[in-house]
Amino acid sequence: MTHNHENDHQHEVITLVDEQGNETLFEILLTIDGREEFGKNYVLLVPAGSEEDESGEIEIQAYSFTENEDGTEGDLQPIPEDSDAEWDMIEEVFNSFLDEN
């Protein structure tokens, strides 16, 4: 398992489109290379321009993706709630990221 702590994603923004066609901007907080263990990569996103709430928390969304054959990033997929091993790995990497920052 590897992850890209050295990549500064603070200014990378992507647009997600929901089922109703609404577009929302998100900033990439962290990418995680989980190909060795799970065969896919992960990305942690925060709504663009979001601020911490009164309790110091901020909404973070996690998705998985696989690279296309041409090397481009594929579509984002929700991570199944019952995939404990994946969530444990994401939490471990995220906590390490927080400790480093």
Curated annotation (Swiss-Prot):
Signal peptide: none annotated. It holds the Pfam family DUF1292. Transmembrane segments: none annotated. Belongs to the UPF0473 family. This is UPF0473 protein SPy_2112/M5005_Spy1795.
